[in-house]
Amino acid sequence: MPLVQIQHLGGAFTREQQTELIRDITDAFVRVSGEGIRNNVLVTMTEIQSGLWATGGVPLTIEEVERRRAARQAAQG
């Protein structure tokens, strides 16, 4: 039975977005393996507190995530 564990910065995704991710991940397994696998796909989401996630030794905060998201959206037009 597939187990997908997702860790993300708390506040980076709304509850609706988290639910959509869970549904889409489950649907991906169904597309590959067939409908019979649906009830056996386990997806967990763990929120990591802002500032307790680091890349290259630099803590990542929700404010930085929002800044990056805004910059990406601005670049897309």
Task: Label each region the model flagged.
Residues P2-G77:
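A domain-level signal for the structural core that forms small-molecule/cofactor-binding pockets
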